[in-house]
């Protein structure tokens, strides 16, 4: 569905994305995560055809990113998605359906079907009078008005209450089950972990980890073991229930604690395994210095990279209040 090769984007000499390569399969939810300035937004906007890459290729199906025909098969939901607030939800979605030349009868059917699935009430209320959660549902509905094959969602549940957040995540899973391909980015890694089939972690413009969440945790995370002894052992801390806790990093150390406890006349009452979360791995990776670059072109500092990731150079925008959206 998506093939990205050697993607590089620079702003004023500063690299926002450095030589990214990845593929996204049809019907997959593909996560793109990283700290501020990592290159996530630049990557998503390049996929959406809003930014021209400095180098590299981005192919989406049979099209290059940015091709007019490709846009007819794409739905893009940016993190900030201003709406035409004097319109109602119905009139707003029909307006965008007209932009895609969707026949009026089909546009009405799609509008009502999507609003039904999103459980959006008050469809004839002004958008400016709606809550943030309702507005986000309308923005999601807009991304679907042309029945796209590919959806690019940047922070789809940002700032929403827990109930609406869970609904948006469930709806995203439903889209993939219906055969849609979704590229999904969020700072809340629980959202990513709960919906994404595969993930790439970016740091300072580079992809530094990739795979399924279990694969990333296994390759980059560290499993720890909490050993509860019945007697004090070296490095242990007393617990409220009268046991002594020692946290170690491998089974050899677990066995060493057992031997020490038994030698002291006690034993091990319990062993608990703590698997790393995606957030644990992310925090570890985001704190590492970037790998040495082979091309010798240098590295922007983190502040410059952050500015670049939200940069303006080469960005295509629509007119009106829906800048950068379709």
Model-derived segments and their meaning:
Residues 147:
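Conserved catalytic motifs of ABC-family nucleotide-binding domains
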Residues 94, 98, 105-122:
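Conserved ABC ATPase "signature" region
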Residues 151-155:
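Catalytic Walker B motif of ABC-type/P-loop ATPase nucleotide-binding domains
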Residues 215, 221-289:
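Short, charged/small-residue-rich alpha-helical element at the C-terminal edge
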Residues 56-66, 70:
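Conserved ABC transporter NBD signature motif
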